């Protein structure tokens, strides 16, 4: 994190997201401020709260991608939720506290994975020993046997088997293994609001039930894999994992709330606006800073970074309740994308669409070559369709590319070894009829 200066963060985001400089700058500063905060004395550190961000812009311009890439960049727990999916406490549906429970679950999986990787080598060695015990059980020594000689012979045979095991000679051999599993004998039918109770009840019942041993017949590589997982779980200190995960959520967690404009009310005192305002009021304590109870323990939300986003076509940011507006002090507007940006999106990012399609079809020995005029034609058509129908931003490129390469993808097995050039003429031939008919472009692209 020390090397991730705001400029460096923007450079990393540039590899995947075209344009939107002001949004990138805002998130880069917010992220750097987290690192700066960690260097302060504890008394001052607790006083500095994250500056939450409100992104305003149409769909498909990179709002979600900026937040997702940001979280991946710093290996922070990240969860994306849609504001419109939540209901007020007391109503059927998910309550807003489940956001923090989901974020804690993500952090638990991340930290557990990291701890598993640290003990992986040791776990594999133990798994190997268990497989060797099955292949060559310990002999029972009798009085008539020369015990020292038998031990030497057993050790030599075991080492030979170990060598064969590591060289893959025994990969096709089947063995019977015993795996431990806890089984709760019934499921609980519940709605989403009851999910936490259901999980806790299942875990509580699971701790009372004896471990069931299940016998399976598997190939040796699979046995090693299953034993490695089992041994790794034994080696991991789950108390330490839980403590680290909660700390990571509290200090580095990022929550992306999409479609926040859908819960903005227009000032009516009845109807759906009342419910929307209720969701905003439920969100407020979490964004402001409160303690949420999860199955892993209490989680404080004071220093979690919240990034909210919405198109705000109908509602305005000022339609959000004043208290919630005040909790998103940084506001950035994202620009609509046009032909120029589409050309760059198709070619520049590390995960550019054209690179993806070239790689996909190359797996079947079909080689695509896109000319510059072909790329510009794809971008131009995407812009035209966005203007004629709904503007869905860069997502339009996906639908246009799918339609353009539909026949090639379908007949790929018959086109082995061929090189296909995608130029402006090819693009027009495939898509011109659809573009001419507004009805067709509305339903197909």
From Swiss-Prot:
It is found in: Cytoplasm. Keywords: ATP-binding, Chaperone, Cytoplasm, Nucleotide-binding, Stress response. InterPro entries: AAA+_ATPase, ATP-dep_Clp_protease_ClpX, ATPase_AAA_core, Clp_ATPase_C, HslU, P-loop_NTPase. The keyword Cytoplasm applies. It comes from the Bacteria. GO terms for molecular function: ATP binding; ATP hydrolysis activity; peptidase activity; proteasome-activating activity. Its main location: cytoplasm. GO terms for cellular component: HslUV protease complex. ATP binds at residues 18, 60-65, 258, 323, 395. GO terms for biological process: protein unfolding; proteolysis involved in protein catabolic process. NCBIfam families: hslU, PRK05201.1. A double ring-shaped homohexamer of HslV is capped on each side by a ring-shaped HslU homohexamer. The assembly of the HslU/HslV complex is dependent on binding of ATP. ATPase subunit of a proteasome-like degradation complex; this subunit has chaperone activity. The binding of ATP and its subsequent hydrolysis by HslU are essential for unfolding of protein substrates subsequently hydrolyzed by HslV. HslU recognizes the N-terminal part of its protein substrates and unfolds these before they are guided to HslV for hydrolysis. Belongs to the ClpX chaperone family. HslU subfamily. This is ATP-dependent protease ATPase subunit HslU. It comes from Thermodesulfovibrio yellowstonii (strain ATCC 51303 / DSM 11347 / YP87).
């Amino acid at each position: 994190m020390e090397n991730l200066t705001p400029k460096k963060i923007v450079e990393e985001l540039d590899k995947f997201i075209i344009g939107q400089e002001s949004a990138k700058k805002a998130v880069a500063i917010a992220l750097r401020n987290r690192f700066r905060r960690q260097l302060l004395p504890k008394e001052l550190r607790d006083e500095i709260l994250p500056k939450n961000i409100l992104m305003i812009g149409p769909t498909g311009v990179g709002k979600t991608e900026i937040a997702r890439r940001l979280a991946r960049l710093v290996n922070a727990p990240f969860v994306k939720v849609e504001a419109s999916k939540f209901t007020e406490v007391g109503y059927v549906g998910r309550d807003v506290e489940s956001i923090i429970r989901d974020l804690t679950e993500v952090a638990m999986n991340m930290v557990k994975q990291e701890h598993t990787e640290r003990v992986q080598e040791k776990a594999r060695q133990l798994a190997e020993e268990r497989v060797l015990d099955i292949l060559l059980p310990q002999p029972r020594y009798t009085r008539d046997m020369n015990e020292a000689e038998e031990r030497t012979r057993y050790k030599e045979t075991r080492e030979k088997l170990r060598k064969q095991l590591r060289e893959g000679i025994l990969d096709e051999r089947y063995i019977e293994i015993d795996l431990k599993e806890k089984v709760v004998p019934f499921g609980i039918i519940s709605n989403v609001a009851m999910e936490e109770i259901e999980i806790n009840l299942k875990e509580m019942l699971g701790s009372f039930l004896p471990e069931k041993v299940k016998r399976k017949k598997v190939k040796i590589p699979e046995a090693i894999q299953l034993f490695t997982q089992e041994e790794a779980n034994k080696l991991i200190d789950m108390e330490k994992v839980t403590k680290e995960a909660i700390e990571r959520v509290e200090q580095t967690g990022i929550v992306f709330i999409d479609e926040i404009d859908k819960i903005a009310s227009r000032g009516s005192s009845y109807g759906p606006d009342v419910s929307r305002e209720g969701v905003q009021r439920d969100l407020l304590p979490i964004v402001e800073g409160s303690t949420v109870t999860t199955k892993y323990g209490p989680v404080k939300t004071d220093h979690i970074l919240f990034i909210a986003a919405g198109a705000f076509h109908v509602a305005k940011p000022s339609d959000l309740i004043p208290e919630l507006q005040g909790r998103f002090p940084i506001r950035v507007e994202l620009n609509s994308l046009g032909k120029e940006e589409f050309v760059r999106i198709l070619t520049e990012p590390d995960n550019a669409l054209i690179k993806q399609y070239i790689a996909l079809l190359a797996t079947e020995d079909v080689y695509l070559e896109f000319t510059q005029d072909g790329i510009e034609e794809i971008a131009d058509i995407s812009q035209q369709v966005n203007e004629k129908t709904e503007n869905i931003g860069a997502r339009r490129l996906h639908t246009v590319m799918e339609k353009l390469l539909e026949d090639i993808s379908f007949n790929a097995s018959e086109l082995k070894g061929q090189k296909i050039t995608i130029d402006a003429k090819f693009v027009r031939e495939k898509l011109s009829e659809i573009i001419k008919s507004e009805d067709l472009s509305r339903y197909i692209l």
